[in-house]
């Protein structure tokens, strides 16, 4: 399945049942991740340090357990700091694909990447999202159904994830789309771009454990040992994602643990 996607997704998307049309925009948009403000967390850290120094001066051992608990809670916040990423492309159900060309130009100018290669890599990512969304519609019998139909509404609810599943759904969707993008870059000979894509997500993972794109690392590591194994794992994730975001997410966590 993955081979078929990569072979046609740029040159012949219609063979995958995808529309060739998509939109471009010069707007600069950012997506925010994380929960805690960096300045506030830094301030809290300085306050904890002052309390620690005061306890050391007073030899107040009884206060240490409470301080240790506060430190543990503060440490967790360090891994959930807010940060923003510039959007290069976006897929929205019912609206289609938009590529943010000004953002792509800005990224290429900053890092010296080939514009056409980066542009097409973003298009690969967003078209995989669209292909995935269409597969969900088919699974729920909603392909071609009216937006008022029960099947369509059920598929929409599933696609976005129900409450606590939403974060897991995001990880699964981005893992499938970004691994396809990364592998496309490799196959097209854009090695520096492929490395940059992976490095960006590894750096973000250090700041926020549930950064959705970070799930791609496990598949990339598996690919390094066996292309066939990575392709099988990708197909397995795709099928799992049509019935259970939780099961697909659990499989991604397993892959990340092995890498």
Regions found by a protein language model. Name each.
Residues 104-105, 137, 184:
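Short, solvent-exposed loop/turn segments at secondary-structure junctions
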Residues 183-259:
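Pan-zinc metallopeptidase signature
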Residues 117, 133-174:
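Post-HEXXH active-site segment of zinc metalloproteases
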Residues 121-137, 178:
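Active-site recognition of the HExxH zinc-binding catalytic motif
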Residues 170-186:
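An active-site-proximal "capping" alpha-helix that borders the catalytic cofactor pocket
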Residues 1-115, 239, 243-250:
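A metal-dependent hydrolase signature that marks the N-terminal structural subdomain at the beginning
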Residues 109, 132-144, 188-194:
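Short, solvent-exposed secondary-structure capping/transition elements
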